[in-house]
């Protein structure tokens, strides 16, 4: 039986809320929750609370929403809670050194990769785009660096040929709470075994941009197919046809050699719109024109066949 800990939880999106939910069902005591300030959302730009705030308030846990933890008065909010440990999951604010050192056991973070690979903001998307065969979560002791702290616990899962960032997100949102509860038990019992990260194995997962999601036909078909899965559901891979953006939801690689220039449509069938790439052919199977719902290539061909005449060069 592990000892009950007084925990401050800091997180913002749904991924974080799933970890808070596991903690609320555990033997530990959540003494306070820190989450980002309410943000405008939706067409009406109404201020909306984060998923973490909604969950915390439903369980009558005190919620704090500073825009920064640098001011002394905001750091005092942390100190006054007298926590044993602070658990940080996709919080979105930097924790100053003073805050990291306040709880008796410091601060720990749930990171969505197998560190030291993919430190940074977009580990799920980068691992998928790179063609990694597995990913996972790492629970680490936080320090002032970017995901540089000692590793306390890891759980891994395979990346399948069908995975998107959305499906991987769900897998890691299930794995993370398991790893977190195990780590907390080890820390409470004094059995945790911190492991220093090997700096020679470090890679960085830079934040995604919408411009980066524009399909670059000079890449190989295999790279582009992974990119499309990595950028689903955000920011979504896209191409430009007739001056308007068209999102690509699903594609597959055709193992044929073509001598057409990258970006050239080589065939348009009900199975897919086949486009030459830097290496191989990419078949676009599910697309979404601006202002429309996602549709099969067959449905899009029925309404916009003039877009996909073989020999046409896509931007």
Curated annotation (Swiss-Prot):
A GO CC term? cytosol
Question: What InterPro entries has UniProt attached to this entry?
Answer: Fmt (IPR005794), Formyl_trans_C (IPR005793), Formyl_trans_C_sf (IPR037022), Formyl_transf_N (IPR002376), Formyl_transf_N_sf (IPR036477), Formyl_transferase-like_C_sf (IPR011034), GART_AS (IPR001555), Met-tRNA-FMT_C (IPR044135)
Please list the GO terms describing molecular function.
methionyl-tRNA formyltransferase activity
Instruction: Give the record's keywords alphabetically.
Output: Protein biosynthesis, Transferase
The enzyme class is: transferase
Catalyzed reactions per annotation: L-methionyl-tRNA(fMet) + (6R)-10-formyltetrahydrofolate = N-formyl-L-methionyl-tRNA(fMet) + (6S)-5,6,7,8-tetrahydrofolate + H(+)
Q: What is its EC number?
A: 2.1.2.9
Q: Which residues bind (6S)-5,6,7,8-tetrahydrofolate?
A: 113-116
Q: What HAMAP family does the record tag this protein with?
A: Formyl_trans
Role noted for this protein: Attaches a formyl group to the free amino group of methionyl-tRNA(fMet). The formyl group appears to play a dual role in the initiator identity of N-formylmethionyl-tRNA by promoting its recognition by IF2 and preventing the misappropriation of this tRNA by the elongation apparatus.
The similarity comment for this entry is:
Belongs to the Fmt family.
Descriptive protein name: Methionyl-tRNA formyltransferase
Q: Which organism is it from?
A: Klebsiella pneumoniae (strain 342)
Q: Per UniProt, what is the name of the gene that codes for the protein in this document?
A: fmt
């Amino acid at each position: 039986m592990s000892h009950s800990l007084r925990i401050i939880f800091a997180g913002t999106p749904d991924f974080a809320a799933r970890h808070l939910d596991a903690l609320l069902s555990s033997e530990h005591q959540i003494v306070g929750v820190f989450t980002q300030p309410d943000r405008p959302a939706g067409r009406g730009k109404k201020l909306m609370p984060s998923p973490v705030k909604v969950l915390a308030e439903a369980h009558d846990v005190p919620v704090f929403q500073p825009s920064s933890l640098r001011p002394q008065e905001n750091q005092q909010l942390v100190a006054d809670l007298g926590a044993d440990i602070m658990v940080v999951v996709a919080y979105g604010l930097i924790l100053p050194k003073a805050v990291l050192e306040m709880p008796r056991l410091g601060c720990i973070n749930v990171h969505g990769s197998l560190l030291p690979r993919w430190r940074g903001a977009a580990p799920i998307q980068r691992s998928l785009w790179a063609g990694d065969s597995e990913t996972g979560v790492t629970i680490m002791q936080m320090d002032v660096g970017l995901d540089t702290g000692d590793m306390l616990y890891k759980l891994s899962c395979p990346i399948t040929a069908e995975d998107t960032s959305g499906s991987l997100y769900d897998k890691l949102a299930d794995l993370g709470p398991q790893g977190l509860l195990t780590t907390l038990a080890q820390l409470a019992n004094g059995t945790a075994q911190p492991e220093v990260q090997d700096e020679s194995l470090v890679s960085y997962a830079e934040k995604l941009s919408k411009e980066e999601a524009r399909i670059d036909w000079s890449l190989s078909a295999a790279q582009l197919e992974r990119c499309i899965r990595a950028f689903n559901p955000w920011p979504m891979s896209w191409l430009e046809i007739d001056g308007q953006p068209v999102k690509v939801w699903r594609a597959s690689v055709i193992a044929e050699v073509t001598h057409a220039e990258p970006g050239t449509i080589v065939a348009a069938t009900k199975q897919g719109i086949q486009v030459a790439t830097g290496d191989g052919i990419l078949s676009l199977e599910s697309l979404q024109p601006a202002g429309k719902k996602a549709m099969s290539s067959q449905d899009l061909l029925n309404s916009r066949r003039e877009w996909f005449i073989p020999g046409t060069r896509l931007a």
